[in-house]
Regions:
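Active-site loop/oxyanion-hole signature of alpha/beta-hydrolase fold enzymes
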Residues: 78-117
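Catalytic active-site module of serine/aspartate enzymes centered on a nucleophile-bearing elbow/loop
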Residues: 257-311
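Short beta-strand/loop motif that positions the catalytic acidic residue
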Residues: 227, 233-235
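Flexible "cap/lid" loop of the alpha/beta hydrolase fold
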Residues: 127, 131-132, 138-167
């Protein structure tokens, strides 16, 4: 933990655009309240989803920057995350269930299609949306996808957390109460995301992890190879939970994709200019009018008069 906090303190702070309760909205899906926030207006719609057990706050600076460039960006908290409801039944949580929540959000907003994207859990949810409702996906932003190469890293990282949330819940709740007392006003973005992660109730957190472990993590390879939506895949080195090999594998599977290498897992939240520009340009390209294929004009052949017959 000291190492992680040291890394967070070492990176330059990014201006935090906080969401007030008045800005955030909710819709009801299967009896549960799902939280979302709209940033900007226009026809270039993009939905951004957070990482595992974090919240939509991690995407607020990116959403604000994209909105300034003419996009309508919707940040969403899936069930069990952020300001959405947090039931304790594990059967409510899976990547495919989160994909259905995204489609329900689009229905609620009367949006026929959108660019969908997110980090880690958000990236895998995006793949599930593309598998279940490809007509609703204009493009995919896939930051840190978690596929076959991440199996061991995920087991090592999240099994101890799941056990702690299940069998040491009082200790976890105590840590959460301490985190809730930290004033957020001068906390940089990465610090605020970390505090949100610590502050959460362990009971629904454990249910989320158990539900995700029980169901599939992402669409299988044969389904991924059938996806036609353009994709921007962002990977980074030195991360066993989000290995760059998974990003490379996905790039080879998706025929209409581009692979972008981030300098580190922190780049988009600490030095976001380069990646924000790439993402904004990608969304613009996804919404650009498609050029109609023009049929080649038939060549006109000069009609020749028949030669006059000799008298």
């Amino acid at each position: 933990m000291k190492l992680r906090l040291g890394v967070i303190a070492a990176v330059p702070p990014v201006a935090v655009h906080r969401i007030s309760k008045s800005q955030m909205a909710h819709f009801t899906y299967e009896g549960q309240q799902i939280a979302y926030t709209e940033h900007g207006t226009g026809r270039k719609v993009c939905v951004l989803l957070p990482g595992l057990l974090t919240s939509q706050r991690m995407h607020i600076p990116l959403a604000k920057s994209m909105a300034e460039q003419g996009s309508r960006v919707i940040t969403m908290d899936p069930l069990g995350h952020g300001d959405s409801d947090k039931p304790v039944e594990m059967w409510r949580y899976s990547m495919r269930q989160y994909a259905r929540e995204v489609v329900a959000l689009l229905d609620h907003l009367d949006v026929s299609a959108a660019v969908v994207g997110g980090a880690s859990l958000g990236a895998n949810t995006t793949l599930e949306v593309a598998a279940a409702a490809p007509e609703r996906v204009k493009g995919m932003i896939l930051e840190m996808p978690v596929l076959e190469s991440a199996l061991l890293g995920c087991a090592m990282a999240f099994t101890p957390l799941m056990c702690a949330q299940t069998f040491a819940a009082p200790v976890m709740r105590g840590a959460g109460k301490v985190a809730s007392l930290v004033p957020r006003r001068f906390i940089p973005l990465l610090g605020e995301v970390a505090l949100d992660w610590i502050e959460q109730d362990p009971a629904p957190g454990s249910a989320v992890l158990q539900g995700l472990f029980f169901d599939r993590v992402a669409p299988p390879r044969e389904e991924r190879r059938e996806m036609k939506a353009p994709a921007l895949i962002i990977g980074h080195p030195r991360d066993p939970v989000h290995p760059f090999s998974d990003a490379g594998l996905l790039s080879n599977e998706l025929e209409n994709s581009r692979l972008l290498r981030a300098n580190s897992i922190l780049e988009l939240r600490s030095r976001p200019e380069r990646l924000t520009g790439e993402i904004t340009q990608f969304v613009t390209e996804c919404w650009a009018p498609k050029k109609r294929a023009t049929k080649p004009r038939a060549r006109r052949t000069a009609s020749r008069k028949p030669a006059a017959s000799a008298a």
